[in-house]
Regions:
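Structural signature of nuclease core domains in nucleic-acid processing machines
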Residues: 1-212
């Protein structure tokens, strides 16, 4: 996908395709091409639909990692995924001023520091969250949004676990140079997550899923 155009419109098109295409289709490229065609009028980009569809096939065949060992997006069908989970949840009492003590992002940072092991990629994010730019911010009112997908996968204990998915099309590395695999190495991904505060997004989405 490195040769495809970037930007918000491209990201919205990819999100729409991943939201509506059936990953278990016998001909996945044809399924993805049809989905691109359906959404192209809303999110036009300078890329042929079949080229974008071909780029999205490997996305579906890439292992999901240790939280879903042996699985890819192609393996998880419509019955095991909830797409676009809309939510609205109260934060520390919602809009009832005085009904709950003030809770700030700095308090959330303290939780991260106390609960996450030192080797966890999100552990170091606590310092950024505790800083003057974010730390004093109060959690008050309501949080609304939409989670791109929730996946149900087998749990090693014999049950199921549920994974939060938020699709990203960010281009990492030097935008003036061709992309290389190292631009998306684990350390680079972790740095991008911290820089864009995606760690906080993931944490909030996990709370939403827990309440759901």
């Amino acid at each position: 996908m490195a040769d495809l155009p970037g930007g918000a419109t491209f990201g919205s098109l990819v999100h729409a395709v991943l939201e509506t295409a059936d990953p278990r289709a016998d001909d996945l490229k044809a399924e993805l091409t049809a989905a691109v065609d359906r959404h192209f009028g809303w999110w036009p980009v300078e890329a042929p639909p079949d080229v974008l569809a071909a780029a999205l096939v490997p996305v579906h065949d890439t292992p999901l990692g240790p939280l879903a060992p042996g699985l890819t997006l192609r393996d998880i069908g419509p019955h095991d995924r909830l797409r676009e989970l809309d939510f609205e949840i109260p934060l520390a009492g919602g809009d009832l001023v005085g009904s709950a003590p003030d809770v700030t992002l700095g308090h959330v940072a303290d939780l991260l520091s106390g609960l996450l092991p030192a080797g966890d990629p999100a552990h170091g994010y606590a310092e950024r969250l505790r800083g003057p730019g974010l730390g004093p911010a109060k959690l008050r009112g309501y949080l609304s949004g939409s989670i791109d997908a929730v996946l149900r996968v087998p749990d090693p204990a014999g049950g199921h676990r549920y994974l939060v998915v938020d699709y990203k099309t960010n281009r990492l590395g030097d935008v003036q140079q061709p992309s290389v695999a190292g631009d998306y190495a684990p350390a680079a991904l972790a740095a991008a997550m911290v820089h864009s505060d995606y760690v906080l997004q993931a944490l909030l989405y996990s709370v939403v899923l827990h309440r759901f």
